[in-house]
Amino acid sequence: MPDTTGGHPAALKVVTLDGPAGVGKTTLARRVADALGIPYLDTGAMFRTMAWRLGPDGPDLDEALLRDRLAGFIFTLRGRGGASVLSCNGEDIGNEIRTEDVGAMASRIAALPVVRECLKAAQQRMGAAQPLVVEGRDMGTVVFPGARHKFFLDAAPEIRAMRRYTQLQTMGEAHDLALLTEQIRSRDEQDRNRAVAPLRPAADAIIVDTGDLDIDGVFGVIMQHIRSRDGL
């Protein structure tokens, strides 16, 4: 298993951004990666890709069969900054995984220990090979507990639902705001109460409430902490 406790030089440069859906993790992770000139890894896209490829019956597969299927997914990362591209089995991951249905399936498979075990190993391999900005739900607590910089982003469900509603509109998808709010509350409960790698901030994470700040404001807070600690 790769050393994620700080012994590997690259591990010192891992920046983790954790938090629930709708707090701006993706946008912020891309910007931070651009500012630092290092690759960006969207771990949520890895779960979504597995869910999309496994299909609706994926979470119900026999564990041995599921483990065999998971072994066939090879993730690679190329490029730097926000333009980093994640691929699965040689195919770039696109917007086909960004639907609400795929997100719901991803939340289900994310609760399975065998799935988290598989992706944790893949993510740690990437972090051991190079500095990274990673976003997810358990990056600072489980995958990269020795990361030099850890942030946990949060906001009220209503604020996050509105952000998601606006995002889906730009993608040409129509959704009911009240339903989105309820879905976010439900996913929060599922993510925070699951037995494996529940959503929670690391003990040494900087907690940022994104509800009262725009993207520029949150980005400024994150970069100030990074530069202060690194003496930049």
From Swiss-Prot:
It comes from the Bacteria. Pfam families: Cytidylate_kin. SUPFAM superfamilies: P-loop containing nucleoside triphosphate hydrolases. ATP binds at G19, P20, A21, G22, V23, G24, K25, T26, T27. InterPro entries: Cytidylate_kin (IPR003136), Cytidylate_kinase_dom (IPR011994), P-loop_NTPase (IPR027417). It is found in: Cytoplasm. Transmembrane segments: none annotated. Keywords: ATP-binding, Cytoplasm, Kinase, Nucleotide-binding, Transferase. Its EC number is 2.7.4.25. It catalyses: CMP + ATP = CDP + ADP; dCMP + ATP = dCDP + ADP. One of its GO terms (cellular component) is cytosol. GO terms for molecular function: ATP binding; CMP kinase activity; dCMP kinase activity. HAMAP family: Cytidyl_kinase_type1. Belongs to the cytidylate kinase family. Type 1 subfamily. This is Cytidylate kinase. The gene is cmk.
